[in-house]
Amino acid sequence: MDRVLSRADKERLLELLKLPRQLWGDFGRMQQAYKQQSLLLHPDKGGSHALMQELNSLWGTFKTEVYNLRMNLGGTGFQNAERGTEESGHSPLHDDYWSFSYGSKYFTREWNDFFRKWDPSYQSPPKTAESSEQPDLFCYEEPLLSPNPSPPTDTPAHPAGRRRNPCVAEPDDSISPDPPRTPVSRKRPRPAGATGGGGGGVHANGGSVFGHPTGGTSTPAHPPPYHSQGGSESMGGSDSSGFAEGSFRSDPRGESENESYSQSCSQSSFNATPPKKAREDPAPSDFPSSLTGYLSHAIYSNKTFPAFLVYSTKEKCKQLYDTIGKFRPEFKCLVHYEEGGMLFFLTMTKHRVSAVKNYCSKLCSVSFLMCKAVTKPMECYQVVTAAPFQLITENKPGLHQFEFTDEPEEQKAVDWIMVADFALENNLDDPLLIMGYYLDFAKEVPSCIKCSKEETRLQIHWKNHRKHAENADLFLNCKAQKTICQQAADGVLASRRLKLVECTRSQLLKERLQQSLLRLKELGSSDALLYLAGVAWYQCLLEDFPQTLFKMLKLLTENVPKRRNILFRGPVNSGKTGLAAALISLLGGKSLNINCPADKLAFELGVAQDQFVVCFEDVKGQIALNKQLQPGMGVANLDNLRDYLDGSVKVNLEKKHSNKRSQLFPPCVCTMNEYLLPQTVWARFHMVLDFTCKPHLAQALEKCEFLQRERIIQSGDTLALLLIWNFTSDVFDPDIQGLVKEVRDQFAAECSYSLFCDILCNVQEGDDPLKDICEYS
């Protein structure tokens, strides 16, 4: 045995078989270890392809060398036996495998010669007439129970019922490859020399065992070939040391049987695990389609669920039904579907689908397994307990709908629409301002100081506090306050943009005037006189100011290309900025700083989106008529914005964090000091108003601090009052003529024409406009 493999290959083979060195040559244990390691190392079982290939190579070499060693043991191989005999009348051809099969005359003669070399006192077993007449394969054994051997019987026995000699190995088809054989007849004559005492038993160390036959047994004419199942049987018994007799086919069959036997005994069968037979009923690839709507189909999700459905074989589902207690199911049921089974269970705690599947996969290493979470437990239970499903068992009698429904709890949430309506009614486009109002509304209404005063500047609060108090309480504990307010502000901007698209500029002007008249209508007597003082101040600002204001409003409303821009030019403190601010307040617009660098001008112009008018405030130029003025980049920037000023084509306006929007740039009111304008810029202004310093107007403002504190001069309501005070109601839109007349009558009741003339005289004299008329506080 030491010559079978090299020392390195022998140690490597024992290492792969995981056997100690002293078991080298014990073919039975080595073959058993080979089967175990093949299951572990096979790639289909999760093993290593390289190790499996190496093990097959070494094991194939080992078996081939053992076979060659056995055939040439002691220098006397079967090849040296006589090839013919006159006794049998059968002359085997060269290398005829069946000529030296177990029990034949040549087999007996060969081994008798072998034993005589080792034991000169060895004698062949005696031949009997009975054994000659009825030849069979058997061996002599020592009697253990009785000193006298039982008489021979002629009772035939099946080959499977023969007694086994412990010193001789069972037939093994997997030891040697199928040698070439000569086609012979099925009913060939049996050699006369092949008698029942054809040979003695052999010990593992080569010694002989002598005994007496227990009787000859007849064999069928065509004994079936030996086929190993699940691998080759061991070459020897558990106490053999490596030398044992191989197995051979007792009788050749037809061509199909020879081919099948050759394939089963081919050397390639030892190089890899034989392929598994395909299942007659392949495992399903998914749950039945009737359950699709009740299962979660998420694969890469860590979400936890309380209900699960496991799909496997019937046997595995029954086993899982008994062992699923690890998850402490509150309810579980076992159902059958076609050739498989399903386990449906609910737990009081939530688990991941992967955790349930990993636990079930320990019991389903071969059987198919599918596991999914159940999103609709009650509906799923109703389906799996009806046809075509079959309910087998459940731990409690069914599920009921009331187990999944709680008593309805009224959970009030913030009314987002109510917040949006509040912002839209008051034209609030600042999210923080909306949030501030609503947080203020959460206070108790009876104890609210702002509501008790009812001041004009607080009218948004005291008009809406009681209406929004309940919703504000919910808003106070809401986690989405900023989102709600941002959405409300976006709604105001969206409504404003929609108006610009759907309404004409005349309609927008009418709406703005209507809002101003409503505010004027709510003024008290003292506030009314204060606004009339502002009207008197404006009438002293420019000659025929009411007509000038009317022309400006008409110019800005009609928005004719190249005939729509207004320029206010004059020295410092001449009233330019105050009038421009009042126009912006009346019409709705924004003030822009155009003196910034050109790279920042794009975002500054983006503020003009959705505006009725804009104001370029305090534009600076390079050439000043007054040497005390500082130069700036405003006029140069205006010269680069000719398309913006003309209003003939749409321009792109952009804001931060938003896309560019293409629209016509709104008409502008530009204020500036005494700077020289180039002809290209001068041509863009259709109306130019030159302001001059009037000391009496400045003195009147200084002496009446309320005009400055309440910003009456910069208010658009002052200009609206000036219009209705100096023009008849026929000039206004018919829709607001009634309101115009009502507001005019209200102010006429507070201030007569003679009283207004007194206010006008006070302004022209540089005194307090309300001197000797009203004590304003």
UniProtKB/Swiss-Prot annotation:
Its EC number is 5.6.2.4. A motif (LXCXE motif) lies at residues 137-141. Residues 12-75 form the J domain. The modification N-acetylmethionine is found at residue 1. It catalyses: Couples ATP hydrolysis with the unwinding of duplex DNA by translocating in the 3'-5' direction; ATP + H2O = ADP + phosphate + H(+). It comes from the Viruses. The modification Phosphothreonine is found at residue 273. This is Large T antigen.
